[in-house]
Amino acid sequence: MKNIKLSALNLVPIREGQEDKDAINDMVTLAQALDDLDYERYWIAEHHNAPNLVSSATSLLIQHTLEHTHSIKVGSGGIMLPNHAPLVVAEQFGTLETLFPQRVDLGLGRAPGTDMMTASALRRDQHNGVYQFPEEVEQLQQYFGPSHQQAYVRAYPAVDKNVPMYILGSSTDSAHLAARHVKGYHMFLQDILLHNK
């Protein structure tokens, strides 16, 4: 049993009778407990326009959690790439990796994590992110790559940073993309369990 590496995902829910700050405090308290139990990873989700969740500013919650834990890896489960410019994601996670070396994970999803009106408000450029997801994953890899392989636009301080990237998904397309480009693939087990019933 000691060889099994355990991880957790937190959507940062606001429980009945709680305020936003209470949910964030609970998020940190859980992370600290899991850190003490030698969990390997603690990931925080990204959701927008969800009144019962406080996980819209994922990178800020990751930083806050890293500041209050010692060794557990903290990351996104995941950053919904259609909502963000890859340059900004690389800059944010490059900064996190600079502040907390070898403790940051970058999980990426291709869904917007919200309804279409909110997704449109997040990316006003009429971005078609679901279909551009593979190219945007490649852009992220470029931004984290070695300085001698960078283009004119560079994502400082992400250059030369080794931030592990994971693809989150439930399809073979996502699995193939992960096999070609990133460290790992995470599949939501509920999809498998419901399919087998």
Question: Across the structure, where does each feature detected by a protein language model lie?
Answer:
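Flexible, glycine-rich active-site loops centered on histidine and acidic residues
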Residues: K2-K5, L9-D20, N83-G145, Y185, ...
